[in-house]
Regions:
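Short, low-complexity, polar/charged sequence segments that are solvent-exposed and flexible
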Residues: 45, 105-109, 139-141, 163-166, ...
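Active-site beta-loop-alpha junctions enriched in small/polar residues
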Residues: 91-93, 124-126, 149-153, 173-175, ...
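Auxiliary Fe-S-binding modules of radical SAM enzymes
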Residues: 1-12, 34-38, 176, 181-247
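Short, electropositive alpha-helical surface patch
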Residues: 134, 138, 143-147, 237-247
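Conserved Radical SAM active-site core
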Residues: 1-144, 153-161, 179-183, 204
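Structural preference for beta-strand elements that scaffold enzyme active sites
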Residues: 85-87, 118-120, 143-147, 167-171, ...
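A mid-sequence, solvent-exposed acidic-amphipathic segment
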Residues: 159-187
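A structural motif corresponding to the C-terminal end of an alpha-helix
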Residues: 110-117, 163-167, 213-224
Length: 247
């Protein structure tokens, strides 16, 4: 596991890497492409998936941003004794449609074996949470937090967590448009607000009105909000960030 440069988690852990959403603003793809070793897998799984039982020396991304299970990393949470807030799979979407359920189960089992940590997951496919919950495969322990990326109203329509008894949060980073949180089927217990980073030509700068409407709704519904520094760059007068747990 690695120390995080973001303020809402203390460490990142990437037993699975790679993603197929193809988001134009993705920092993870840029990183994996930069350090892509360009190796050829002698025994890839169907669908272009990869399993690494052992570390390949000197390269964290031997197959670039193609989905890969780094099985040798599964014991890392157990080997980290001091409690941490862990962002799980910061370099992947663990709950993407292309990820085998068996991979997800291996990761969740590894988390359960190290209950001293708080685990934060994040996906653009929250329906997978429901599917796993219906199969009794989704942990409900208090140290598991399930996040959904909600960048605009299109993502709100995909959020269907109402009635599921789990800790949930939204990551509105990057915020790409106005979001009417009242339209969601179920509300999160925490919100992270942030702006797009990088220098792509179509980079979206969030409007103050978008931010203020979200903050007002969260205040009314007692939902704590964490403000990323990349958003404070535009709006330095934002209130102090808050967490749903004691810090």
């Amino acid at each position: 596991m690695n120390k995080m440069k973001i303020d809402w988690a203390t460490m990142s852990w990437n037993p699975v890497t790679g993603c197929r959403h193809g988001c134009p603003y993705c920092y993870a793809r840029r990183t994996a492409t930069r350090f892509n070793a360009g190796l050829e897998d002698p025994a890839p799984l169907a669908g272009g998936l990869h399993v690494l039982p052992e570390k390949i020396k000197a390269t964290p991304y031997p197959y670039g941003f193609e989905p890969a299970l780094h099985r040798y990393r599964l014991g890392q949470p157990q080997n980290t004794k001091e409690p941490q807030t862990v962002f799980v799979c910061s370099m992947a979407d663990l709950f993407g449609r292309w990820v085998p359920t068996s991979w997800i189960v291996e990761v969740l089992d590894a988390c359960r074996k190290a209950p001293q940590h708080r685990y934060l997951f994040l996906t653009k496919n929250p329906a997978r949470y429901l599917e796993l919950d219906h199969l009794a495969l989704l942990p409900h322990e208090s140290n598991f937090w399930y996040g959904s990326t909600v960048a605009n109203m299109d993502a709100v329509g995909m959020y269907v967590m109402q009635g599921v008894n789990i800790n949930s949060f939204w990551s509105m980073e990057p915020l790409l448009g106005p979001v009417d949180m009242a339209a969601a089927e179920g509300l999160p217990e925490w919100v992270i607000l942030g702006a797009e980073t990088g220098n792509r030509p179509d980079k979206v700068t969030p409007a103050r009105e978008w931010v203020d409407n979200i903050v007002a709704f969260c205040e009314e519904n007692e939902i704590p909000v964490f403000f990323k520094d990349n958003l404070r760059k535009y709006f330095p007068d934002l209130p102090a960030s808050a967490f749903p747990w004691e810090v």
